[in-house]
UniProtKB/Swiss-Prot annotation:
Tissue: Brain. Appears to be mainly expressed in two pairs of bilaterally symmetrical cells in the protocerebrum.
Role description: Inhibitor of fluid secretion by Malpighian tubules. Uses cGMP as second messenger. May function as an antidiuretic hormone.
Keyword Amino-acid biosynthesis annotated: no
Keywords: Hormone, Neuropeptide, Secreted
This protein's name: Antidiuretic factor B
GO MF annotation, one: hormone activity
Natural source organism: Tenebrio molitor (Yellow mealworm beetle)
GO cellular component: extracellular region
Localization (cell): Secreted
An annotated GO BP: neuropeptide signaling pathway
Length: 13
């Protein structure tokens, strides 16, 4: 899961 809150990418899985 990566909503972009700790990374510059937003996947929203």
């Amino acid at each position: 899961y990566d909503d972009g809150s700790y990374k510059p990418h937003i996947y929203g899985f």
